[in-house]
UniProtKB/Swiss-Prot annotation:
The keyword Glycoprotein does not apply. Part of the 30S ribosomal subunit. Contacts proteins S8 and S17. May interact with IF1 in the 30S initiation complex. One of its GO terms (molecular function) is structural constituent of ribosome. Belongs to the universal ribosomal protein uS12 family. With S4 and S5 plays an important role in translational accuracy. Interacts with and stabilizes bases of the 16S rRNA that are involved in tRNA selection in the A site and with the mRNA backbone. Located at the interface of the 30S and 50S subunits, it traverses the body of the 30S subunit contacting proteins on the other side and probably holding the rRNA structure together. The combined cluster of proteins S8, S12 and S17 appears to hold together the shoulder and platform of the 30S subunit. InterPro entries: NA-bd_OB-fold, Ribosomal_uS12, Ribosomal_uS12_bac. Residues 9-20, 113-125 have a biased composition (Basic residues). The keyword Lipid biosynthesis does not apply. GO terms for cellular component: small ribosomal subunit. This is Small ribosomal subunit protein uS12.
């Protein structure tokens, strides 16, 4: 417990909040180029082939990004928009690719939660 005099001299040190998406450097999104598109397996209780991409961002960082939704058109050299947001069962994946922006097409035949997957409103008949 510091004395009042010690607090006057030094003061309290503010606890610095660590960024959960440091590669974005405080920006909401960053543009990048796919270096490698591949699948990986999730952590223990789950089983699947999760679609991920290694992306070189415009600021020089290289990060692993999750590709959400069913099916995608991404390949090497695709230009993508990356946002923060981790995937709980994929260690080291702290970013997601935004569907429907730049080279990443929206999810086909998506009826619900369309805005999250970059899908246009279906035609009414």
């Amino acid at each position: 417990m510091p004395t009042i005099n010690q607090l006057v001299r030094k003061g309290r040190e503010k606890v610095k909040k660590k960024s959960k998406a440091p590669a974005l450097e405080g920006n909401p999104q960053k543009r990048g180029v796919c270096v490698r598109v591949y699948t990986t397996t999730p952590k223990k209780p789950n089983s699947a082939l999760r679609k991920v991409a290694r992306v070189r961002l415009s600021n020089g960082y290289e990060v692993t990004c999750y590709i959400p939704g069913i099916g995608h058109n991404l390949q090497e050299h695709s230009i993508v928009l990356v946002r923060g947001g981790r995937v709980k069962d994929l260690p080291g994946v702290r970013y997601k690719i935004i569907r429907g922006a730049l080279d990443a097409a929206g999810v086909k035949d998506r009826k619900q939660s369309r805005s999250k997957y970059g899908t246009k409103r279906p035609k009414e008949k």
